[in-house]
UniProtKB/Swiss-Prot annotation:
Its EC number is 3.2.1.49. Homodimer. The keyword Lipid metabolism applies. The gene is NAGA. GO terms for biological process: carbohydrate catabolic process; glycolipid catabolic process. The keyword Endoplasmic reticulum does not apply. Placenta. It catalyses: Cleavage of non-reducing alpha-(1->3)-N-acetylgalactosamine residues from human blood group A and AB mucin glycoproteins, Forssman hapten and blood group A lacto series glycolipids; a neolactoside IV(3)-alpha-GalNAc,IV(2)-alpha-Fuc-nLc4Cer(d18:1(4E)) + H2O = a neolactoside IV(2)-alpha-Fuc-nLc4Cer(d18:1(4E)) + N-acetyl-alpha-D-galactosamine; a neolactoside IV(3)-alpha-GalNAc,IV(2)-alpha-Fuc-nLc4Cer(d18:0) + H2O = a neolactoside IV(2)-alpha-Fuc-nLc4Cer(d18:0) + N-acetyl-alpha-D-galactosamine; a globoside IV3GalNAc-Gb4Cer + H2O = N-acetyl-alpha-D-galactosamine + a globoside Gb4Cer. GO terms for molecular function: alpha-N-acetylgalactosaminidase activity. Glycosylated. Removes terminal alpha-N-acetylgalactosamine residues from glycolipids and glycopeptides. Required for the breakdown of glycolipids. This is Alpha-N-acetylgalactosaminidase.
Length: 12
């Protein structure tokens, strides 16, 4: 689940 936490830029 890449809700923004696993992504480079923390959007979530």
């Amino acid at each position: 689940l890449e809700n923004g936490l696993l992504r480079k830029p923390p959007m979530g």
